Design a protein with these regions (language model features):
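Alpha-helical transmembrane-bundle signature of multi-pass membrane transport and export proteins
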Residues: 1-422
Length: 422
């Protein structure tokens, strides 16, 4: 399953990177790039908690079959409309939103299935290995996207007809559609059941189940604080959608350079995930989490100030490395403190924070950048100010949340839940 998931992730990363470049060549607008984040986050906010509820009440394997099939269909549609020259900005936004909606159901079921496949003692290593696969995809996907775009047409001039300029984009979307096939075959043949055993005293009513999941998350301090820091740090520092501006106007690197810059966080993240998979983190992992977020903010500032390709590349790699270390800590904490029967709902709530933060951050960055006459200057201001905001949030939580500073997962156990009867 790991290999087929890796192939699918490469395809997904290719499409994500291509969407931003697609929007840039259609509009040449920083705000339009920022709106991609809004288009992606709205379905997450609407559907992710429901997706978590579905993951806790239905066979997770079957849910994944439906969601993976839906994302295949969306990728095919994107490829067809792009190839035919019918790729309006509105249609690109709509299909991007459809992918995000499917992901809101896919992610809780996928993440909640992992703890059923490995022993608890191996969970941190398993999560790190999965992150390694994701980061390999985060390197290969953007790099392949840049090479395909550079080898076909690159960016179209502002105001020019785009017919003939988007053949590379169509190819990327078709490749993503094909990449889902291996996962679907694996899911159909997977022997492990995705069904869960409902805990004694757990509510049967879907609305009551939803309330139970929300009550668990928001009455567990370590979950609340880690999700809060995750949201605000990525909200302020979220700026990957502005990379087409940096590649095209600041660094003059073109589509190939754009692909490598988008791959840079994946390279750093791969280093971080491989290291965490073979080395135990020190005690009080909460402090590791806080320092990782601080480095994330500092690297973001460096990225915004840089005017050299390799310094920008290195800063983005450090962004990926620090983010991966914090992600390993966050995900392990959440899985260890959450009972299996509640993992889907917890993951659904977490998706609002985990994915909502960076996507809304893209909108914020695009809006700030659009306030300046020069897209290059506006993008730099947006990124640097976001990095400063991340440092301030990390400092605030470090001083106010002892449960995070002192957290040590060696003492963590899933909470006894539900503790109340219906």
């Amino acid at each position: 399953m790991a290999f087929s998931m890796l192939v699918s992730l490469v395809g997904t990363q290719m499409q994500n990177v291509a969407i931003d470049w697609h929007v840039w060549i259609l509009t040449r607008s920083p705000l339009a790039l920022g709106l991609v984040g809004l288009v992606r986050v709205v379905p997450i906010v609407i559907f992710s908690i429901v997706g978590g509820l579905v993951a806790d009440r239905r066979d997770r394997r079957r849910v994944l079959i439906v969601t993976q099939s839906a994302m295949t269909l969306v990728a095919l549609t994107l490829g067809v409309v792009t190839l035919l020259g019918r790729d309006t900005i509105g249609l690109v936004y709509l299909l991007t939103a459809c992918t995000s909606a499917a992901g809101a159901f896919d992610n809780p079921s996928r993440q909640s299935l992992v703890p059923r496949l490995v022993p608890e003692k191996d969970l941190p290593g398993a999560l790190a290995i999965l992150l390694s696969g994701f980061q390999v995809a985060s390197i290969g996907g953007p790099a392949l996207t840049g090479l395909i775009l550079a080898g076909t047409a690159g960016a179209a001039p502002a105001g020019a007809s785009l017919h003939g300029h988007t053949g590379g984009l169509a190819l990327i979307y078709f490749l993503n559609a094909v990449s889902f096939l291996g996962v679907l075959v694996t899911l159909f043949t997977l022997q492990t059941s995705g069904e869960i055993t409902r805990a004694e005293g757990a509510p049967e009513n879907p609305l009551a189940s939803l309330k139970e999941g929300l009550r668990f998350v928001f009455t567990t301090p370590i979950l609340v604080w880690t999700m809060t820091l995750d949201f605000f740090a990525t909200f302020f520092a979220g700026s990957m959608s502005l990379l087409p501006i940096f590649a095209d106007q600041v660094l003059k690197a073109g589509p190939a350079g754009y692909g490598w810059l988008r791959a840079a966080p994946g390279i750093g993240a791969l280093i971080g995930s491989v290291w965490t998979s073979v080395h135990s983190l020190p005690r009080r992992q909460g402090r590791v989490f806080l320092w990782a977020v601080a480095v994330y903010g500092a690297a973001t500032i460096t990225f915004g100030l840089s005017r050299g390709f390799w310094l920008t590349f290195g800063a983005l790699a450090l962004v990926g490395l620090s983010d991966t270390i914090s992600t390993v800590v966050r995900q392990t904490v959440r899985q260890l403190v959450t009972p299996d029967a509640l993992r889907g709902r917890m993951t659904g709530v977490n998706m609002i924070f985990f994915m909502g933060g960076p996507q809304l951050g893209e909108l914020e960055a695009g809006f700030v950048a659009s306030l300046f006459a020069s897209a290059a200057l506006g993008a730099s201001v947006a990124v640097v100010s976001g990095g400063v905001g991340t440092l301030l949030v990390a400092a605030f939580i470090a001083t106010r949340a002892k449960v995070v500073r002192e957290y040590d997962w060696s003492a963590a156990r899933p909470s006894a839940w539900p503790q109340e009867k219906k």
